[in-house]
């Protein structure tokens, strides 16, 4: 089958809470200065590579939307259609949202910390609706009702992301459009797991860096015809190592 479908995945740039080493999840924080620079560089990489996004899919969280806007502006594609969906939101980190990662690691130990952070099917404790970090009263999720998560594991993220991939994103790919998905570490890990057929155990080792475009060439069944490639491999390696080290002082 022909490699006629180009898919670009872009994790949002470094956020204020990434900078402070806090669990973020669905808390709506903005990009740091570093994150803005990463997003602009991502757009420059797209332009330099000749990849021209025809449509953008992103989440309802500001850091992803900001990243997309800066990247598209740098690539002179700010005018393309945009589809936003909660299904591309970051994994909901439950009661961990707002906590310092290093302090959480010290309090609960490395085994529990990694279980909450990287296990496929073990979610953190749920977030109470009266927490200052709750989304229970957030108007952007008013239509979710019982679907509004209070915590998630990666398995849950896949369950809410895949229907959107299958109903919306693949439709654009089938139409011959180059698709840019600007989202989050775990929603993109969920999609990469699906695309690359990564096992439930091995997905724990996958770390996606902030602000570096990852390019897939897909066949007509939306299977990769070759391994996905970062447009800046060196920056991606440094960024992935930084993600892996989160929790350390």
Swiss-Prot record:
Keywords: Gluconeogenesis, Glycolysis, Isomerase. Its EC number is 5.4.2.11. The active site is at residues 12, 90. It comes from Leifsonia xyli subsp. xyli (strain CTCB07). The record marks 184 as: Transition state stabilizer. Substrate binds at residues 11-18, 24-25, 63, 90-93, 101, 117-118, 185-186. NCBIfam families: pgm_1, PRK14115.1, PRK14120.1. This is 2,3-bisphosphoglycerate-dependent phosphoglycerate mutase. Catalyzes the interconversion of 2-phosphoglycerate and 3-phosphoglycerate. Belongs to the phosphoglycerate mutase family. BPG-dependent PGAM subfamily. Pathway: Carbohydrate degradation; glycolysis; pyruvate from D-glyceraldehyde 3-phosphate: step 3/5. HAMAP family: PGAM_GpmA (MF_01039). GO terms for biological process: gluconeogenesis; glycolytic process. One of its GO terms (molecular function) is phosphoglycerate mutase activity. It catalyses: (2R)-2-phosphoglycerate = (2R)-3-phosphoglycerate. It is an enzyme of class 5 (isomerase). The gene is gpmA. Pfam families: His_Phos_1.
